[in-house]
C-alpha cells in the first residue's frame, strides 16, 4: 500500500470508528488498516507481548508517519483528543482478595512519554457521541 492509499485507509477507518462508537483509537486503527493483527493486539493486551510496536508489521519510521496521519486527520476533523489509560487484561487478584493489580501497557520500544501518550490518545467526536446517546435512549426507553 503506497502512502496515498494508506492515508485514505486511515481516514476511512477513523471516520467509520467515529460513526460506529463516537471515537477512533490508534490501536484499533492499526488493526483495521492491516498493520497489526487482531491476535497480536490481544496478545499485547494480555501482556504476552512487551510493547505494541514490536507486534506491528511496519518499521518504526512508517509507524511514526501513520501516527502523524492519525493526529492530522483528528485535528482537521475537529475530533477532541482524549487520553485513555491502557491496562493489561486478564490480571488475577493477588491471593484471591482485594482489588486486582493494575498493570499499565507499553506501546513503544523507547518508552518515551510523548510517544506513549499519542498511542493512548483516542479522538472523540462529541456530536456523534451525543447522537449515539439519544439513539440508545430511544431504543431503551
How would you name each of these model-derived features?
Residues 2-27, 32, 36-37, 43-55:
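Positively charged, polyanion-binding regions of nucleic-acid-associated proteins
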Residues 39, 60-141:
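Phospho-regulated, low-complexity intrinsically disordered regions of nuclear gene-regulatory
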Amino acid at each position: 500500500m503506497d502512502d496515498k492509499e494508506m492515508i485514505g485507509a486511515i481516514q476511512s477507518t477513523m471516520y467509520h470508528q467515529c460513526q460506529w462508537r463516537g471515537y477512533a483509537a490508534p490501536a484499533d486503527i492499526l488493526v483495521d488498516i492491516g498493520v497489526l493483527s487482531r491476535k497480536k493486539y490481544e496478545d499485547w493486551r494480555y501482556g504476552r507481548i512487551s510493547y505494541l510496536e514490536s507486534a506491528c508489521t511496519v518499521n518504526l519510521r512508517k509507524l511514526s508517519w501513520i501516527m502523524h496521519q492519525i493526529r492530522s486527520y483528528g485535528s482537521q476533523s475537529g475530533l477532541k483528543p482524549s487520553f485513555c489509560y491502557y491496562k493489561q487484561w486478564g490480571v488475577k487478584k493477588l491471593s484471591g482478595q482485594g482489588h486486582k493489580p493494575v498493570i499499565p501497557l507499553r506501546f513503544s520500544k523507547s518508552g518515551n512519554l510523548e510517544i506513549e501518550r499519542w498511542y493512548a490518545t483516542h479522538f472523540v467526536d462529541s456530536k456523534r457521541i451525543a447522537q449515539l446517546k439519544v439513539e440508545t435512549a430511544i431504543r431503551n426507553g
